[in-house]
């Protein structure tokens, strides 16, 4: 699954640490998601979509 988390994070001038704290996860989790090494749980995907005010489908898409 590809995603636009990195681009969205940068558009808000957030560091990986900042987004991790907002979402209640580790910086390593954010790194893995941004590098397409980890597909987030549905709960985490929903938190990300709520934070960025976008649908899960807009942020995460099949490769």
Which role does the model predict for each range below?
Residues 4-22:
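Short basic helix-loop element that most often maps to the first helix and adjoining turn
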Residues 10, 38-39:
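Short amphipathic helical patch at the helix-1/turn junction of helix-turn-helix
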Residues 17, 28, 57:
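Residues within helix-turn-helix
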Residues 25-38:
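Recognition helix of helix-turn-helix/homeodomain-like DNA-binding domains
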Residues 53-63:
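Short C-terminal boundary/hinge segments that cap the last helix of small helical domains
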């Amino acid at each position: 699954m590809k995603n636009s988390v990195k681009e969205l994070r940068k558009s808000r001038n957030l560091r990986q640490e900042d987004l991790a704290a907002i979402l209640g996860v580790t910086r390593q989790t954010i790194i893995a998601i941004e590098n397409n090494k980890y597909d987030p749980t549905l709960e985490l995907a929903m938190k990300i979509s709520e934070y960025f005010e976008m649908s899960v489908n807009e942020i995460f898409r099949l490769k």
